[in-house]
Design a protein with these regions (language model features):
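Solenoid-like repeat scaffolds
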Residues: 2-7, 41-57, 83-94, 124-142, ...
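Alpha-helical solenoid repeat scaffolds, predominantly canonical TPR units
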Residues: 36, 83, 119-122, 169
Length: 180
């Protein structure tokens, strides 16, 4: 607290919030997950993400991008669809992609396939704009978004009644997540 958020310890705090988010999601507890999302935002001010040398957004922006995933995990489809895009989509490139992913899954789950397809296009376009150097732990965000692309594709295909193609896409998602 003495030196605020503008130090290396912000990374440790974000890492801890990330563990709380995913632990709560695994345990089926939305409230702790959302509190941890809020904590991540509070511990990582935008001014820190705007530091260019070293490029702090590449290290930390992904950690404030998980709320859309929490909404998907708990089937909060309408909230996911209504989730606002960040004003600065270049700075918050990971969050922007996650919002489109969550909206796409939400629309698919509600049977709104045309809207889901539009969000899939938006997701793929947002994915292309994520800097290659952006990371979450030891993973590049681009690699993780590729997992989401196949997952979203599978969700949409399933809602279109193309079950074999849907399950093939979902298997590709799992294979990408498992890694080489």
């Amino acid at each position: 607290r003495k030196h605020g958020a503008m130090n290396l310890y912000t990374g440790y705090r974000l890492h801890n919030y990330h563990f709380v988010i995913y632990g709560a999601m695994f345990l089926g507890q939305i409230e702790p997950a959302l509190r941890a999302v809020k904590g991540a935002w509070e511990t990582c001010p935008e001014e820190m993400l705007r530091i260019e040398s070293p490029p702090m957004a590449d290290y930390f922006e992904s950690y404030v991008s998980f709320e859309p995933h929490v909404l998907v995990r708990f089937g909060k489809w309408n909230e996911a669809i209504a989730f606002p895009l960040p004003e600065d989509q270049k700075l918050y490139a990971t969050l922007t992609a996650h919002v489109h992913y969550a909206r796409g899954v939400g629309h698919a789950a509600l049977g709104q396939v045309d809207d889901a397809l539009r969000e899939e296009e938006n997701y793929l376009a947002a994915m292309e704009r994520v800097p290659k150097a952006r990371v979450v732990h030891n993973n590049t965000v681009v690699d993780l978004l590729a997992v989401g692309a196949e997952m979203l594709r599978g969700e949409i295909l399933y809602r279109q009644g193309k079950y074999d193609e849907a399950f093939a896409a979902l298997r590709r998602s799992v294979a990408l997540d498992d890694g080489p």
